[in-house]
Amino acid sequence: MSTPQNRIRNFCIIAHIDHGKSTLADRILEETGALSQREMTEQVLDKMDLERERGITIKLQAVRLFHRAEDGQEYQLNLIDTPGHVDFTYEVSRSLAACEGALLVVDASQGIEAQTLANVYLALENDLEIIPVINKIDLPSAEPERVKQEIEDVIGLDTSEAVLASAKTGAGIKEILEQVVTKIAPPKGDSEAPLQALIFDSHYDAYRGVIAYIRVVQGTLKPGMRIRMMATKKEFEVTEVGVFTPHMTFVDELKTGEVGLVAASMKNVQDVRVGDTITAAQNPAPAPLPGYRKVTPMVFCGLYPVDTVDYEDLRDALDKLKLNDASLIYEPETSDALGFGFRCGFLGLLHMEIIQERLEREYGLSLITTAPSVVYRVTTTKGEVMEIDNPANLPQVNKIEIIEEPFVKATVMVPKDFVGTVMDLCQGKRGIFSNMEYLGINRVMLTYEIPLSEIIYDFFDQLKSRTKGYASLDYEMIGYRQSELVKMDIMLNGEVLDALSCIVHSERAYTRGRALVEKLRSLIPRQMFEIPVQAAIGNKIIARETVKAMRKDVLAKCYGGDISRKRKLLEKQKEGKRRMKQVGNVEIPQEAFMAVLSIEE
């Protein structure tokens, strides 16, 4: 049975992490009878174990539900679950583009957080109808009236009809569904027009190849059609179209306004880009849907297998992850210290942690990761512009005209008691103050422009610890700016460890170098000979510590006796240590590579 276009509603849920988005989605599935009681698990839509454990949504999911509204009609509701995290902003923006409305879920005790705001602005840019939902009203600390006021003050949404709900107890779920039906507009579009469908996610299926999640904007999609991707110009023949009713179910066609999936024996996730438009090869649409852009990684790091024989396994694992995650990029690289590995690019720190954890968990690899770095832009004296994602590749100082680094606009929301300490932190991270705004009586929104390289180290951890966990952060790229940057090398026993090189601001280089060598001295196990640990910029050593040698008591056998006898033994030991030092290698523990991240200056 097919639903007429005016009875289709496409909506998504916007919320900050932990405001109860996935639980609310569970309740909605339960209310509409999409799943039997037996199949209900917590967070049905978060399919990966990792998502469940961390309580975050990483990949998008889309579900088709049927709901009989109070007017007696049956409506088709397509719920698109979105990730709430900064790193996945582009994915969120694409899934918002596939909807006509959004539920804005706000925690009744915590109020609005930074990422809620960021996503609301994205939703407003896409002209979505926003339905405010105050969640967790069953909590003793809930203050729904204050939160309503906050939403009105900060976002300017009318909250007189906001739904008070509790995803835990199931209160208010019926009202939410009624509001979805009455307030959100049905999809526009003409089912006779040339096909236009927006891809908002994809995943790889071992039997069917790549499966694209799509929203049909114009026209109709049926099995057997030849389709063309408008950004990559690739053509395929559709084998199956279907929907998720959380389980994959195949249907005869997807009509205008519907959300579903399409399989067309596509072998490579690269061909199916999020945000791209699918059209018919015979009768193509005149223009693609707006808003597509290529995803650019922001953070890079090196991944090396602990045991070099695992190199091929690591490559296979990355290939497989890449099938599901088009935003991951990687290329082989070698390091003198760590052997063969890959240089990988990620959307952000959370994305990086998740990929590392999936490699270790799903593919059983043990990895060494180098400190993350951002992409610097270097203009050489010859006028060439280079993008450097690995500090080891930075040209020599005398060949560099200017170095630029990426800046972000960071929005931090904090209770007003912590404003001082947060401003202090941002200035310490070379932040430039741009704005401060009071939201209600107790909360402040601070806006800073900060170099991305300062944020990827330990900004978030420090922010949380200085504000007792109350602050929330959101950031977006604002472009490149010129900075005084230098490359700092770490030398062990006189040899440069390329994996520990980092690019630092020249004012910070000394303190950073000092802190790093002290940290390394405590982490590197003592050897039979002494090891100098040095930080150098170019040829100039700026800091040094020494890992002292262990020594055997060679005088144990001499009872009394002549001093020259003892001296002979000590000289012999000293000579042995000197020879050992020339040939000796130093084993470096994994903690040493992560030390770069956690040093307090």
Swiss-Prot record:
A Gene Ontology biological process term: positive regulation of translation
Gene Ontology terms for molecular function: GTP binding; GTPase activity; ribosome binding; translation elongation factor activity
Topological category with respect to the lipid bilayer: Peripheral membrane protein
Residue pairs linked by disulfide bridges in the UniProt entry: none
Location relative to the cell: Cell membrane
Residues bound to GTP: D18, H19, G20, K21, S22, T23, N135, K136, I137, D138
Enzyme class, broadest EC rank: hydrolase
InterPro entries: EF-4, EFG_III/V, EFG_V-like, EFTu-like_2, G_TR_CS, LepA_C_sf, LepA_CTD, LepA_IV
EC number: 3.6.5.n1
Keywords: Cell membrane, GTP-binding, Hydrolase, Membrane, Nucleotide-binding, Protein biosynthesis
Segments forming domain tr-type G: 6-188
Any single Pfam family the record assigns to this protein: LepA_C
Catalytic reaction annotation: GTP + H2O = GDP + phosphate + H(+)
Any one cellular-component term (Gene Ontology): plasma membrane
Function: Required for accurate and efficient protein synthesis under certain stress conditions. May act as a fidelity factor of the translation reaction, by catalyzing a one-codon backward translocation of tRNAs on improperly translocated ribosomes. Back-translocation proceeds from a post-translocation (POST) complex to a pre-translocation (PRE) complex, thus giving elongation factor G a second chance to translocate the tRNAs correctly. Binds to ribosomes in a GTP-dependent manner.
Family of this protein: Belongs to the TRAFAC class translation factor GTPase superfamily. Classic translation factor GTPase family. LepA subfamily.
Matches recorded under PANTHER family: TRANSLATION FACTOR GUF1 HOMOLOG, CHLOROPLASTIC (PTHR43512:SF4), TRANSLATION FACTOR GUF1-RELATED (PTHR43512)
Annotated protein name in UniProt: Elongation factor 4
The organism of origin for this protein: Desulforamulus reducens (strain ATCC BAA-1160 / DSM 100696 / MI-1)
